[in-house]
From Swiss-Prot:
HAMAP family, per the entry: Ribosomal_uL2_B (MF_01320_B)
One of the GO biological process terms: cytoplasmic translation
Species of origin: Alteromonas mediterranea (strain DSM 17117 / CIP 110805 / LMG 28347 / Deep ecotype)
InterPro entries from the UniProt entry: NA-bd_OB-fold, Rib_uL2_dom2, Ribosomal_uL2, Ribosomal_uL2_bac/org-type, Ribosomal_uL2_C, Ribosomal_uL2_CS, Ribosomal_uL2_dom3, Ribosomal_uL2_RNA-bd_dom
One MF term in the entry's GO annotations: transferase activity
Its biological purpose: One of the primary rRNA binding proteins. Required for association of the 30S and 50S subunits to form the 70S ribosome, for tRNA binding and peptide bond formation. It has been suggested to have peptidyltransferase activity; this is somewhat controversial. Makes several contacts with the 16S rRNA in the 70S ribosome.
Entry keywords, A to Z: Ribonucleoprotein, Ribosomal protein, RNA-binding, rRNA-binding
Keyword RNA-binding: yes
Similarity-based family: Belongs to the universal ribosomal protein uL2 family.
Gene assigned in the entry: rplB
Protein name (database record): Large ribosomal subunit protein uL2
Region (Disordered): 28-54, 223-265
Taxonomic path: Bacteria, Pseudomonadati, Pseudomonadota, Gammaproteobacteria, Alteromonadales
GO cellular component, one term: large ribosomal subunit
């Protein structure tokens, strides 16, 4: 997809770089697959901030995405590709032979009119979903389950993919984009190909306001705060913080391991690249 660099007609347009996809549907989304998407402003039920840097932003509907892809043996046709404000990837509206419509993540190269299907008997073709025990070693996949039947959790953002490296008993070994190699049950499903819209990372919003439209508030440096607000705060004049970098709660923020699920450590063959 081409990148469009805006003309510098104003300071806010000067640095804008947009991803242009002429194949995206220009009308309204499919209403039966929309849900209310309430904003929390990063607050919990007590009104306290539990996640910083969240607030404002344009109103959005949530598009219900089929991450399970469990309509086995029923062929489907891609009706159209759509923009989804809730994720970096584009989505595709597919019509199944029994009349049901669902949204799925749009893989690279998918276009309107393509035929897809799910199940262990589906051909090895981009957009088809199969249990990984039926996918050849070396195949690039996305939308990968971590538990059979739970729905895709790995490799769902724009341009994401993983590669099946080996099959060992009830497990397959995957290499993720991060460099991590991990085992996943071979009954877990994955979709062939990589997620589309890989150029998403090349875009430039151009101004702070465009980030605010997306519901993201500014991030203030700890050294610019007062001592009551952050361990790096305070001091006479400008300081470097006076200690190794930490979070507002005093946890080291560069290099400290924060993974705590030791039960599944055995499934990680190699940690991600640093």
């Amino acid at each position: 997809m081409p990148l469009l660099k805006a003309k510098p007609t104003s300071a806010g347009r000067r640095h804008v770089v947009q991803v242009v996809n002429p194949d995206l549907h220009k009308g309204a989304p499919y209403a039966p697959l929309l849900e209310k998407n309430s904003k929390s402003g990063g607050r919990n039920n007590n009104g306290r901030i539990t996640t910083r840097h969240i607030g404002g932003g344009h109103k959005q509907h949530y598009r219900v995405i089929d991450f399970k892809r469990n309509k086995d043996g029923i062929p489907a046709k891609v009706e159209r590709l759509e923009y989804d404000p809730n994720r970096s990837a584009n989505i595709a509206l597919v019509l199944y032979a029994d009349g049901e419509r669902r949204y799925i993540l749009a893989p690279k190269g998918m276009k309107a009119g393509d035929a897809i299907q799910s199940g262990s008997g589906a051909p090895i073709k981009s957009g088809n979903t199969l249990p990984m025990r039926n996918i050849p070693v070396g195949t690039v996949v996305h939308a990968i389950e971590m538990k059979p039947g739970k729905g895709a959790q790995i490799a769902r953002s724009a341009g994401a993919y993983a590669q099946i490296l080996a099959r060992d008993g009830n497990y397959v070994t995957l290499r993720l984009r991060s460099g991590e190699m991990r085992k996943v049950l071979s009954d877990c499903r994955a979709t062939i190909g990589e997620v589309g819209n890989a150029e998403h990372m090349l875009r430039s919003l151009g101004k702070a306001g465009a980030t605010r439209w997306r519901g993201i508030r500014p991030t203030v440096r700890g050294v610019a705060m007062n001592p009551v607000d952050h361990p790096h705060g305070g001091g006479e004049g400008r300081t470097s913080g006076g200690r190794h970098p930490v979070t507002p709660w005093g946890v080291p923020t560069k290099g400290k391991k924060t993974r705590s699920n030791k039960r599944t450590d055995k499934l990680i063959v190699r940690r991600r690249n640093k």
